[in-house]
UniProtKB/Swiss-Prot annotation:
A Pfam family assignment: Iron_traffic
Organism field: Cellvibrio japonicus (strain Ueda107)
GO biological process, one term: cellular response to oxidative stress
Protein name: Probable Fe(2+)-trafficking protein
GO cellular component: cytosol
Function: Could be a mediator in iron transactions between iron acquisition and iron-requiring processes, such as synthesis and/or repair of Fe-S clusters in biosynthetic enzymes.
Family indicated by similarity: Belongs to the Fe(2+)-trafficking protein family.
Keywords: Iron
Keyword Iron: yes
One function term, GO molecular function aspect: iron ion binding
InterPro entries hit by this protein: Fe_traffick_prot_YggX, Fe_traffick_prot_YggX_sf
Length: 91
């Protein structure tokens, strides 16, 4: 049976992550309060931000920015969108 958590983003019981995505207290908080669905959506959104904004993931400023965006995304706050991104149409 899958481990269930009360997801911070969706405000409901959903399947939890299989393991903490980061070491330490931050990773444990994500493990305890973020669903697998929300985390997968964040990973896709983060990839889109990196690609569309041409972010350098080796830059400390980028890491701080992405951490802030992750917090906003997973907390249901307003978060940045990729400028000029047009989702593919379902034809």
């Amino acid at each position: 049976m899958a481990r269930m958590v009360f997801c911070r983003k969706y405000k409901q019981q959903l399947e939890g992550l299989d393991f903490p995505p980061y070491p330490g207290a931050k990773g444990q908080d994500l493990f305890d309060n973020v669903s697998k669905k929300a985390w997968q959506e964040w990973m896709a959104h983060q990839t889109m931000l990196i690609n569309e904004k041409r972010l350098n993931v080796m830059d400390m400023g980028t890491k701080v920015y992405l951490t802030e965006q992750m917090h906003k995304f997973l907390s249901g706050e307003g978060y940045d969108q990729a400028d000029g991104y047009v989702p593919p149409s379902n034809q």
